[in-house]
Amino acid sequence: MSVRRRLAFVLLAWSAAAPAARAAGQPATATLSATISPQASLTLSTASLVFPDADPDVLNKVPATGGPVTINAKARATQGQAVVLTVLASSDLRSGLDVIPASNVTWTASGAGFVAGTLSATVPAQVATWTGSGLHSGSQQYFFRNVWTHPTGTYTTTLVYTLSAP
């Protein structure tokens, strides 16, 4: 191979390889974006509470059968913001035309952030509160105030739990 041909071959090979070599060393950037919105998830261990009949002289606070309601709350919230769990009775307890105020139902609580309270049909009662995102578990043991003056009947209402994470 002549010197000219060799030189032409080397120059051609070098010119073809040079852009690839320079491109391999060029930095590039990409933007990664993840949107994390406030979100909440709530699970209860039971969908019904039952208070058995009892003699008011023997038991003036009747515990719900089945033991405490276990509550699992998951929330994503803005850092430093409160996450609040409340419960509200849809109405007072009713049996036909007879009514027993929801305030005859109370609860004790266990678990970080959980508090004892009294049921209401007008104002949501606080069950628990936390700060920021997280997973929280606790329980409520419900009690019914058992007195001689309650009219007989089977009384019902619906409990509406609300978990809010701003």
Annotate each language-model stretch with its function.
Residues 1-8:
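Bacterial N-terminal signal peptides that target proteins for export
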Residues 8-17:
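Bacterial N-terminal signal peptides
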Residues 22-166:
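N-terminal small/polar-rich segments of proteins
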